[in-house]
């Protein structure tokens, strides 16, 4: 497990502009060393179901992903999912990986059992979720997350992610 320190929680609070909720682990750190993606359990302490296991916290990262979402890439990806069976199969496997990783926490939340994030397994709705999954899981797990990640500039290069 990627432990969460008080310093990490303080950094995430600064990144989000609010107190972070139920951070289970740091799933990915930017090259600058700051948390960039966190793991959140499928049920928050207040009882709310929360299917988004991988959540991007770095404001520089989320800003460049937001810019990428304005380019029409999600529509292109959705078109390819409809016509490319290999891509659709790999994307469905990414959905399965997402659910398996979240399920490994051992927290049963029937409301989100088959729900991943970002539109998986059949469409693309949120590049933030897909990129967060790719950063956390590593390359060759989420093909569309990897594709989006490859299109991003080096968000950490000029300033740390806080």
Task: For the regions a language model picked out, list residue spans one by one.
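Preference for intrinsically disordered or flexible, low-complexity segments
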Residues: 1-162
């Amino acid at each position: 497990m990627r432990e969460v320190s008080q310093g990490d929680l303080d950094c995430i609070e600064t990144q989000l502009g609010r107190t972070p909720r139920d951070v289970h682990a740091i799933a990915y750190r930017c090259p600058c060393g700051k948390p960039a993606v966190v793991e959140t359990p499928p049920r928050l302490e207040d009882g709310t179901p929360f299917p988004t296991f991988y959540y991007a916290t770095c404001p520089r990262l989320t800003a460049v992903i937001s810019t990428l979402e304005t380019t029409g890439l999600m529509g292109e990806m959705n078109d390819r999912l409809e016509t490319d069976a290999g891509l659709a199969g790999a994307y469905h496997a990414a959905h399965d990986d997402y659910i398996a990783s979240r399920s490994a926490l051992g927290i049963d939340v029937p409301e989100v059992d088959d729900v991943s994030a970002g539109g998986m397994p059949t469409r693309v709705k949120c590049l933030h979720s897909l990129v967060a999954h790719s950063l956390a899981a590593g390359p060759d797990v989420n093909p569309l997350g990897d594709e989006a990640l490859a299109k991003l500039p080096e968000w950490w290069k000029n300033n740390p992610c806080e």
